[in-house]
Amino acid sequence: MTDIIRSDAATLAAKIAIKEVSSAEITRACLDQIEATDETYHAFLHVAADEALAAAAAIDKQVAAGEPLPSALAGVPLALKDVFTTSDMPTTCGSKILEGWRSPYDATLTARLRAAGIPILGKTNMDEFAMGSSTENSAYGPTRNPWNLDRVPGGSGGGSAAALAAFQAPLAIGSDTGGSIRQPAALTATVGVKPTYGTVSRYGLVACASSLDQGGPCARTVLDTALLHQVIAGHDPRDSTSVDAEVPDVVGAARAGAVGDLRGVRVGVVRQLHGGEGYQPGVLASFEAAVEQLTALGAEVSEVDCPHFDHALAAYYLILPSEVSSNLARFDAMRYGLRVGDDGTRSAEEVMAMTRAAGFGPEVKRRIMIGTYALSAGYYDAYYNQAQKVRTLIARDLDAAYRSVDVLVSPTTPTTAFRLGEKVDDPLAMYLFDLCTLPLNLAGHCGMSVPSGLSPDDGLPVGLQIMAPALADDRLYRVGAAYEAARGPLLSAI
């Protein structure tokens, strides 16, 4: 079993195709690992053993019959963040207000996974409605980092990252609103990609902030992440924000990058995301070593200035709560989910107020209040409108930067994983943890976090963030795969 659960997805898929191992064997090995370890890590909110084994059996039947398989990852199981709707298992978004709720339909991303023959092991833990940076805001308890059980795995998608690091699954799906894929990847020594906004369907992705949210792939290697990216990307007419454009050849880029030649690739180091208050020395040392490695691979490295990045955090934490305030108004106790106080003596308004008070956690309530205030008539122009203007300036900074470089790089996070409970009562400190990742969400561009070693400060994982323009996701994979090949694999400490 150990060989199976520690194998990369591409290797497992190849073995399935030649009947060296069955999808059922792989899926059972992952389920056994979940059963043996998840009491410790709490990566999963729901495990769908029967459904996953049935999907695996269907692929094995196709292999036995000599039929062509539906995708390059057919038969390789996956962990799905509990923010994507699934018709056959609960979708809670880490919130009490949706406890036990089952969607009548699959998200487009879920449907594409099923069509590709990928068994879904279950739904992973997350910060409530994707609001948080540590997975401590889940109504169902925190997830622990497999590298150190006293540390957080990042957020909001810490469950998906922990499942990969604990060898519970070879593939995972996350969503990224301000770094929720990339940041957990950095803290768990896994790979996570935020695709270009609009290239992966948001239909069935329960909204946090609609102009920022983006589903994306996670795995333990760059190639595995590319193979999963290829499965989930593509235009969806049911998503009004979906981009009708050709998906870049991310798999070809990953394979080309693995050769380890970056000659001719121009890499920019973002001055505003490299050093300053709040950055751990070990993270900066790891980043500088990564830049040296890129140079050794032939890349042309220069420093790039993005002056409005200094205002990105403030703009983000006005735009995001404003969209949260609007999106979460749908949880009104009338249509689905929790209902409190409906004893026939109270008005609909009273029932709604009681339900939202009982069903939402402190961080969700905080952001609803901030957003409602920012959108109010007396403050809309002073706060929300100004934040949107800063957002435009950040996008212009990036556009200007890409006129002289092909990709940008920075640390993914300013520090390694912090201790459980360390920042939970200090929301401003928690928000600062998204400093390096959220500018890409504001601009709609793409980004990757790839492991860049262990910090000399505490021995915990550090991530290198690679950024590229919209619809240039293939650049991430070329550079990421080249760096990964030079650095070598970095697996979990378990």
Curated annotation (Swiss-Prot):
Gene3D superfamilies: Amidase signature (AS) domain (3.90.1300.10). Its EC number is 6.3.5.7. The keyword Oxidoreductase does not apply. Keywords: ATP-binding, Ligase, Nucleotide-binding, Protein biosynthesis. One of its GO terms (molecular function) is glutaminyl-tRNA synthase (glutamine-hydrolyzing) activity. The active site is at K81 (charge relay system), S156 (charge relay system), S180 (acyl-ester intermediate). One of its GO terms (cellular component) is glutamyl-tRNA(Gln) amidotransferase complex. It catalyses: L-glutamyl-tRNA(Gln) + L-glutamine + ATP + H2O = L-glutaminyl-tRNA(Gln) + L-glutamate + ADP + phosphate + H(+). It comes from the Bacteria. One of its GO terms (biological process) is translation. Allows the formation of correctly charged Gln-tRNA(Gln) through the transamidation of misacylated Glu-tRNA(Gln) in organisms which lack glutaminyl-tRNA synthetase. The reaction takes place in the presence of glutamine and ATP through an activated gamma-phospho-Glu-tRNA(Gln). Heterotrimer of A, B and C subunits. Belongs to the amidase family. GatA subfamily. This is Glutamyl-tRNA(Gln) amidotransferase subunit A. The lineage of its organism: Bacteria, Bacillati, Actinomycetota, Actinomycetes, Mycobacteriales. The gene is gatA.
